[in-house]
């Protein structure tokens, strides 16, 4: 039986990499317009290198860029980059197709929903609120809640505790096999690999299910729970049964 489904956030519910790319591109244009005298390709390479060092959630990337290049931070250039980044992020932060409908159908079936993310607490909640999902999930666990990243057991144990369900009655859904799938399976959760969000060209996910559309989770839950009268897949969603993991 499946009583709860736990989601990774980035590249599982939201297309994080597209959002990040659009926002960084906009920030570069904003800084150049404000007087940054560097080629776009050079600026992008420098920014990518800083993210590689500090992580994609690092919030002072433009400060570090300017300090390294010029030995000081020009507030006009910095502010222009930040504003352009925020505006582009807000417009580019979107859910994957059929996510709202899938979440609605799962809640309608009485399935509890959770989120486990390696991102900082405030960044997770900002994304959820921007997407109007702040009231959707029964439990949200971020890096700041356990100080341990997936596939470590602590974040999975924490979300299961908050949801009030045993691991054997929960399904973990994520795009990163080595973190989401491995971490969930290690505790005895069923697992689904969000192939639609995979950025690593994963061949063998090791998950119980591979899904190409998030709405497939509704069929998985119905099948495991023996439900009848399942909701029809939305237009554009795969009509076939969920694929076994490859």
What is each residue range found by the language model?
Residues 1-5, 17-18, 68, 100, ...:
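Asp-based, Mg2+/Mn2+-dependent phosphohydrolase catalytic module
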